A protein has these predicted regions:
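Short Gly/Pro-enriched loop/turn and capping motifs at secondary-structure junctions
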Residues: 148, 160-164
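Individual transmembrane alpha-helices with interfacial aromatic-anchor signatures
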Residues: 174-182
């Protein structure tokens, strides 16, 4: 059984109760590590994501902008190793609903292009290589807590999304849907500029 040992998420996104005409600058940093005890030995997986965003707040409740993600994954087994690098480039729209002076909720809807490149090794010999590109869309709701002067904390417990990949060197088309509410947690800081 896969066991999640550590999830670290640092989100730096714009103040959820933002003012019309301001600029949103922010992003996420995520790190995950897992260890699986299998019959063939231990398998360790580490992943890292960096996701900056820039947007324009065209209404007190609405923001639109561009987002980018760069990801790296490494999986080590007893005699095997897998490395994968990926990126996403797209646009997002955010709707924010203030609940009080202290609390707001918001949802980000993003969509765009994604690409991935991976390599698999067995006993340090390259056994396969893959390149893929496709499209993604995701929806992430969150809670904002205003701490002081626009600085605050963001809390998210997952989201939902859909991704497609077409691989260059093999005849494989991949489509994935995820719904991970309650399976992940992201805690971050935010500031409106």
């Amino acid at each position: 059984m896969k066991k999640m040992l550590l999830i670290l998420a640092l989100s730096v996104v714009g103040f959820a109760n933002a003012q019309k005409g301001t600029i949103l600058v922010g992003g996420d940093i995520d790190y995950t590590t897992r260890t699986v005890d299998a019959e063939t030995g231990k398998i360790k997986m580490n992943s890292f994501d960096f996701s900056p965003k820039v947007g324009y707040q065209f209404h007190d409740n609405w923001t639109a902008g561009a987002e980018f993600t760069i990801s790296s994954l490494k999986q080590d087994g007893q005699m095997s190793e897998v490395k994968n690098n990926a990126y996403k480039v797209g646009a997002f729209v955010r709707y924010t609903m203030p609940l009080s002076e202290t609390f707001s909720v918001f949802a980000d809807l993003g969509a765009g292009f994604t690409a991935s490149k991976g390599k698999a090794y067995n006993n340090d010999d390259l056994i396969s290589e893959s390149k893929a590109n496709g499209f993604y869309t995701d929806l992430t709701p969150a809670l904002f807590i205003n701490m002081k002067k626009g600085f605050g904390l963001n809390f998210s417990i997952g989201g939902l999304g859909y991704t497609t990949y077409s691989y260059d060197n093999v005849d494989i088309d991949e489509r994935s849907f995820y719904f991970n509410f309650g399976k992940t947690i992201s805690v971050g800081i935010s500031k409106n500029f």
